């Protein structure tokens, strides 16, 4: 499964998010972009959860980390949230030696005074991938039942 396929399907799922007239995000689990093994996005009780990997697996670690942070921005925008709404980010690096690059880009990206809970571990990722992030964020009020 390519990162491009994932992004395309995630975008389609997020478009559906805005088209649903009966929004029950507070009481029902909402799954978007479902496959047999996973959903691209899940929203429950005002919290969205999803995973990001770089669209371009040919980029180096710096390029992939920058891509993933940018992709998080895009998903947050689509669910009407912001980086200040991030609750938790779990980061998997193929090589912990890249953590200095991660920290440099992360410190520029995270809004001052609003860091989410964060963990960073080394993991054996799919070939060509340097980083994978699991994100949770509060969903904007207008995307929830009142």
What is each residue range found by the language model?
Residues 11-87, 93-146:
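N-terminal presequence-like segments and the immediate start of the first folded domain
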């Amino acid at each position: 499964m390519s990162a491009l396929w994932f992004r395309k399907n995630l975008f389609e799922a997020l478009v559906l998010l805005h088209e649903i007239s009966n929004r029950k995000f507070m009481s029902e689990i909402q799954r978007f972009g479902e496959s047999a093994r996973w959903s691209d996005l899940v929203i429950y009780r005002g919290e969205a959860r999803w995973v990001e990997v770089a669209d371009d697996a040919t980029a180096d670690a710096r390029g992939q980390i920058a891509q993933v942070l940018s992709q998080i921005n895009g998903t947050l925008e689509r669910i009407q949230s912001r980086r200040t709404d991030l609750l938790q980010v779990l980061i998997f690096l193929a090589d912990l030696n890249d953590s200095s690059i991660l920290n440099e880009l992360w410190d520029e990206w995270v809004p001052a005074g609003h860091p989410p809970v964060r963990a960073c571990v080394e993991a054996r990722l799919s070939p060509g991938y340097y980083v994978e992030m699991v994100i949770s964020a509060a969903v904007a009020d207008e995307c929830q039942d009142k």
